[in-house]
């Protein structure tokens, strides 16, 4: 994405995720500064968007000496109009770039939150699977020897064992991140 090969990405080595290209230089520094926390990343993003909004407001305001010089030369043919058109085109381009950066940061925050949720869900499923495997191996009939020399009068050894415990349940966690994801994607967890 940043035009550099994956091996030469500065600052992106610690942030590279399996199967994803390295982050661009600007975003990798931002992610390193935040320690990888999407909440911190969102806070930094909101600060940056406020700064960009202030800069775009300042760019829209006429700057004193240049504006005055342009109005003094308004009598000449096409000379002053070109810089004004060029300045307005640059200002529009700058505004569009700021909007795209804000959209990129918003999407990055959403993707990072989604990535964290997927990782949490995978770990939860792995833990649940491990517990179920362990539970089934402890309570399966194959764990006892098939007829350990018992006569027909004796009870099988599993009759004296307590009944199987209820199936394991995973507690549902609902925090602000989960609620934010549900609202953002309208899915139920």
UniProtKB/Swiss-Prot annotation:
Chain positions covered by the region annotation Disordered: 54-82, 136-175
InterPro entries, sorted: LURA1/LRA25
Compositional bias annotation for Low complexity: 68-79
Tissue: Widely expressed. Expressed in the early postnatal brain.
One Gene Ontology biological process: establishment of cell polarity
GO cellular component: cell surface; cytoplasm; lamellipodium
GO molecular function: transcription corepressor binding
Record field: compositional bias (Pro residues): 159-169
Phosphoserine modified-residue sites: 28, 188
Keyword match Cell membrane: no
Assembly mode: Interacts with SKI. Interacts (via LRR repeat) with CDC42BPA (via AGC-kinase C-terminal domain), CDC42BPB (via AGC-kinase C-terminal domain) and LIMK1 (via LIM zinc-binding domains). Forms a tripartite complex with CDC42BPA, CDC42BPB and LIMK1.
Family membership: Belongs to the FAM89 family.
Annotated function: Negatively regulates TGF-beta-induced signaling; in cooperation with SKI prevents the translocation of SMAD2 from the nucleus to the cytoplasm in response to TGF-beta. Acts as an adapter that mediates the specific recognition of LIMK1 by CDC42BPA and CDC42BPB in the lamellipodia. LRAP25-mediated CDC42BPA/CDC42BPB targeting to LIMK1 and the lamellipodium results in LIMK1 activation and the subsequent phosphorylation of CFL1 which is important for lamellipodial F-actin regulation.
Official protein name in the record: Leucine repeat adapter protein 25
Organism: Mus musculus
